[in-house]
């Protein structure tokens, strides 16, 4: 028998994915039913070909799907053909100020070109030629509107880079590209303030079926930037908005990719990977949880399977969390109960907890399907 308590129905956490047109970036697709992709940007001088390709290789190994490279000079533009040819993932050329570099990037075989309508010289007058060359070459465009370089006309109209100002700029440029029958573009409307950024993307999502690239610009150092991007992305992705993401951090680019992938995994938008769940420790803990979690994480960092490992420090939440994991330990009184898929398989001394978990994890990994990416860590 069911009893109606008159409580409101619980909404689904994630709304259906917003329906967008699908565009091609090299060997990957963006929008439509394609997965949400993670993007980053190299921090090397693009003219340093070896260093740039090395960083792209590191990003690829970390799970990056698309990489952007800076093109601030003619020398950078002249080496793009080498970068684009040797990169393992699609390359987007980042162009500001000089329209000639847009054409150079298209000719170089880049998968896409990011154009900034706020600072490229006489940009509106260039769109016809850009659309013609990009269409002929099969190159897509990202219309990258940024609060820090908004069109002066819109700044005069709105007084500051408001959400509506960002959207007006993006919609205007999108309309010009479409007038030339060019539709292979995605749009970003980045702002340093997560609330303004969310407002802008919500407004933009209502205006057309363009794929959207999410980003909080100038997000800040690793901790602050992670919080800002995670907050904004979670809101938008939960509403079905977003087709590619970049977590902008004042940190090595690989860290951007790790955070981006973890945001997607946390929302169930990417396949789960190795996950270490550990308690934050408290006065009840009878073992050094921090040390155990760190040693287990280090010992399993090369595993590439969707395995959940719980490292718990006491008998309050420990047994429950350990039972819910694929593998876990509930510790106390100098020993640990080892759980495998909900069942206690043995009790070992504290000194044997880490070796036992590593042994069991590798055994379980051999029975599981292959996955890819970096391990994730959750503190519960």
UniProtKB/Swiss-Prot annotation:
Binding site for [4Fe-4S] cluster: 279, 282, 314, 321
UniProtKB keywords: 4Fe-4S, Iron, Iron-sulfur, Isoprene biosynthesis, Metal-binding, Oxidoreductase
Catalytic activity of the protein: (2E)-4-hydroxy-3-methylbut-2-enyl diphosphate + oxidized [flavodoxin] + H2O + 2 H(+) = 2-C-methyl-D-erythritol 2,4-cyclic diphosphate + reduced [flavodoxin]
InterPro entries assigned to the protein according to its UniProt record, in alphabetical order: Dihydropteroate_synth-like_sf (IPR011005), IspG_bac (IPR016425), IspG_bac-typ (IPR004588), NO2/SO3_Rdtase_4Fe4S_sf (IPR045854)
One biological process term in Gene Ontology: isopentenyl diphosphate biosynthetic process, methylerythritol 4-phosphate pathway
Recorded family membership: Belongs to the IspG family.
Protein name: 4-hydroxy-3-methylbut-2-en-1-yl diphosphate synthase (flavodoxin)
Protein species of origin: Tropheryma whipplei (strain Twist)
Taxonomic path: Bacteria, Bacillati, Actinomycetota, Actinomycetes, Micrococcales
């Amino acid at each position: 028998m069911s009893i109606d308590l008159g409580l409101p129905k619980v909404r689904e956490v994630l709304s259906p994915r917003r329906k967008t047109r699908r565009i091609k970036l090299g060997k990957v697709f963006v929008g439509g039913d394609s997965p949400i992709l993670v993007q980053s940007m190299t921090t090397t001088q693009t003219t340093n070909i070896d260093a740039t390709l090395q960083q792209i290789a590191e990003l690829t190994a970390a799970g990056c799907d698309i990489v952007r490279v800076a093109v601030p000079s003619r020398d950078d533009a002249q080496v793009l053909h080498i970068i684009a040819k040797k990169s393992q993932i699609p390359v987007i050329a980042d162009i500001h100020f000089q329209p000639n570099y847009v054409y150079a990037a298209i000719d170089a075989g880049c998968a896409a070109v990011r154009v900034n309508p706020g600072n490229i010289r006489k940009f509106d007058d260039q769109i016809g030629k850009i659309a013609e060359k990009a269409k002929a070459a099969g190159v897509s465009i990202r219309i990258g509107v940024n609060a820090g370089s908004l069109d002066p006309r819109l700044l005069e109209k709105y007084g500051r880079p408001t959400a509506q100002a960002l959207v007006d700029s993006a919609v205007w440029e999108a309309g010009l590209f479409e007038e030339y029958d060019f539709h292979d573009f995605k749009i970003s409307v980045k702002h340093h303030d997560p609330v303004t950024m969310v407002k802008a993307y919500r407004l933009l999502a209502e205006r057309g079926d363009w794929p959207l690239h999410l980003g909080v610009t100038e997000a800040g150092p690793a901790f602050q930037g992670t919080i800002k991007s995670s907050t904004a992305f979670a809101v938008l992705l939960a509403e079905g908005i977003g087709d590619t993401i970049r977590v902008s951090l004042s940190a090595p680019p690989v860290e951007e990719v790790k955070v981006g992938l973890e945001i997607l995994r946390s929302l169930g938008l990417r396949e789960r990977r190795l996950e270490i769940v550990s308690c934050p420790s408290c006065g009840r803990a009878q073992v050094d949880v921090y040390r155990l979690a760190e040693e287990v994480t280090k010992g399993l960092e090369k595993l590439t399977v969707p395995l959940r490992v719980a490292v718990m420090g006491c008998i309050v939440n420990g047994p429950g969390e350990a039972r819910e994991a694929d593998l876990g330990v509930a510790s106390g009184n100098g020993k640990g109960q080892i759980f495998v898929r909900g069942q206690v398989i043995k009790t070992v001394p504290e000194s044997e907890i880490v070796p036992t978990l590593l042994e069991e994890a590798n055994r379980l990994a051999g029975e599981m399907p292959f996955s890819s990416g970096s391990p994730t860590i959750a503190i519960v």
